Amino acid sequence: MLEDLAIERHRAAMFRTDLSRPIKLAVEFEIINTKTTFFDYGCGHGGDVKRLSSMEVNSAGWDPYYKPDTPLISADVVNLGYILNVIEDTEERLESLQKAWKLTNKVLIVAAQVLVSSISSKNQLAYGDGVVTSRNTFQKYYEQGELKKYIDSALEVDAVPVALGIYFVFRDEQEKENFRAEWYRSGVIAPRIRLATKKYEDCKQELEPLIQFYTKRGRLPAPGELEPEVEENILLEFASIRRAFKVILQATDEAEWDAIAYRRSLDIQVYLALVQFEEERPRFLELPEKIRHDIKAFFGTYRDACEVADEKLFSLGESKVIKAACKTSKIGKQTPDALYVHITALGELEPLLRIYEGCASRVFGRPEETTIVKLHINQPRISYLYYPDFDTDAHPALKASIVIDLKTFRIARGDYSKRKNPPILHRKETFVSPQYPQYEEFARLTEQEVELGLYENPSHIGTRNGWQKYLEQRCIEIRGHQLFEFEHDITPHASLEN
């Protein structure tokens, strides 16, 4: 009988050679750093604890089977990674989540297996609200939305999705909003120095923190936003922050600073729109002080900022609006039914399209291995495509995809890794921005392929085999990102690159 099954939970613990995905993300987002303490609740073999300790993070872990004698201690960051999946008793599952939360000072990381496609029934047996695997371990698979509701209800919180099946739960509401706002911040770099005046050179050290602040926030700092010593030094030398910034403007291109300010105002629009999409928008005084200063600087009032964000969010309900935005986008590769954008160029899309993608990534989390994002035009869907060899292969093959339907909120996964004839990419430079390190190399190859007429029959070259066959017919071989011409039965001998 099912009741007589003895579930061997410890057999679900995995041996890893690297940090687990939830911990890796926490490190990337600087949730975990050398100044934080870390506790792994249900650490298994203790791999994450060992690796974080080697990174000089104060770490400890407990596991009922492998480390039962380790004391349960509170920490800044607590990890409950893939534990909820393996507990067959629903009351014990809830208790584990709540215990981990009680140990959390700042951020609780919750990770669980989620359903992204139908589960194979082979060698599995229904058990409770999950399945028993062939290894005699219990597995509870959640829908992504179901997992968030479970965490929110059990802890009375608003968990933040970071990736599929991975959530950060913040103790401090303002820290949560800071994290969200940082998520939507597009990448920019400080304008380069064009004319180093004597005053700039003499005060370079004092001015650098001001340059960094404006680059990050797109505005001048309010009193108290800079480190006290930094602010004091600037005021002693220049009498005011504004006068100090004038010295920076004299050494740089003012238009570039205006562009940064504009980009940051768009980031705030995206943030406010997607916070409203996820849940009820916080009141102005509930926002972190820095975000309040951002809103005042760019919009004047919170109401005006919200009206601009809401206008864009609500317009997404009209497919013609999305279609027009995709068709006029200066970033990405356009096709009749979609806009394809490299992950590094997402922040350069206009706010409407960033909000469109955010409706998927902020509810479900963005898949970690995303290379290309596909924004569908004719239906509310976002696809995340994985091309592991994008940089090195001239025409990389699709390995996997995640498709999120924004109407049904269903997730589907496609696995192309075993296909003998997978889809491939052409014109790689169209997916990225001109600032991408290999943009020129990609563009040069495309120019050569166009000159040789290799794109004249697009229906024949969309897959690896079709493309290779076409190249062979034209006596052309590609090595790296260079074309070589050869004669039949003769080794390639000449690069076609000018």
What does each of the following model-derived ranges do?
Residues M1-E3, R11-I32, F168-V169, Y184, ...:
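Basic, alpha-helical nucleic-acid-binding regions used in initiation and control of genome expression
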Residues G81-N85, A181-G187, Q334:
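Long, continuous compositionally biased terminal/linker segments
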Residues L94-L108:
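A short glycine-rich, Lys/Arg-flanked "PGG" loop and its adjoining helix->strand segment in the class I
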Residues P22, H45, R93-S96, I291:
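Amphipathic coiled-coil/heptad-repeat helices and related helical stalk/stem segments
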Residues G44, E88-E92, A297:
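Short, glycine/acidic-rich beta->alpha junctions
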Residues V77-E91:
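A short SAM/SAH-binding and catalytic strip from SAM-dependent methyltransferases
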Residues M1-I73, I109-K199, L452, H460:
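Class I (Rossmann-like) S-adenosyl-L-methionine-dependent methyltransferase catalytic domain
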Residues T104, S117-S120, G130, T137, ...:
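Class I S-adenosyl-L-methionine
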